[in-house]
């Protein structure tokens, strides 16, 4: 665990008041904070770590084990579970849990370490996220593009994400391919369009909206409300 704690401190994670002798070790980071990248580096440098995820696993590589789906843990290895908030029943075998608590706050635990800074989210999108009440900031040098209009007031570009059932029905009726926020956890796209039948004032503080807008690393379009 000492190696992991040293790594977290070097990456700018802050400590909470929760004692380190309480287990498992819980680490929280906002979307785009480099959580998965840090875990991959840990795997590459130390063979005694195993990292599983409830999100999207790494592709098979001949050079590294990568982040895998939950499975057998080599005896003696320090086991880490990423995206732990996606399932409350898969935590017992792990000594450390990582997640973005905003993606599933109802299943989040009190953390030992946290990081509120994203390195991916463009500044305009980050400002909108923060204005909706999330503790969120960005170090990205990209301003990005943010456009907010009614649901029928602009084109649907890039990866289209529907965040309510009415939006899903509307998109299906018009033959538009879309995904739900839960289908793109841990992924990122250069262009994202978020579609909702409700206006931004109603959806801004929702987990689904947060999950959707943090998938964008460039151009962000919000088509919401009438």
From Swiss-Prot:
PROSITE patterns: PSRV_HELICASE. Residues 1-138 form the (+)RNA virus helicase ATP-binding domain. GO terms for biological process: symbiont-mediated suppression of host innate immune response; transport of virus in host, cell to cell. It is found in: Host cytoplasm. GO terms for molecular function: ATP binding; RNA binding. Its main location: host cell. It comes from the Viruses. The keyword Transit peptide does not apply. It comes from Potato virus X (strain CP) (PVX). One of its GO terms (cellular component) is host cell cytoplasm. The keyword Transport applies. Residues 139-226 form the (+)RNA virus helicase C-terminal domain. This is Movement and silencing protein TGBp1. Transports viral genome to neighboring plant cells directly through plasmosdesmata, without any budding. The movement protein allows efficient cell to cell propagation, by bypassing the host cell wall barrier. Increases plasmodesma size exclusion limit. Acts as a suppressor of RNA-mediated gene silencing, also known as post-transcriptional gene silencing (PTGS), a mechanism of plant viral defense that limits the accumulation of viral RNAs. Keywords: Host cytoplasm, Host-virus interaction, Inhibition of host innate immune response by virus, RNA-binding, Suppressor of RNA silencing, Transport, Viral immunoevasion, Viral movement protein. Belongs to the Tymovirales TGBp1 protein family. TGBp1, TGBp2 and TGBp3 seem to act together for cell-to-cell propagation. TGBp1 is the main movement protein that physically cross the plasmodesma with the viral genome. TGBp2 and TGBp3 would facilitate TGBp1 function. Homodimer and homooligomer. Interacts with capsid protein. Interacts with host AGO1; this interaction targets the host protein for degradation, thereby suppressing the antiviral RNA silencing.
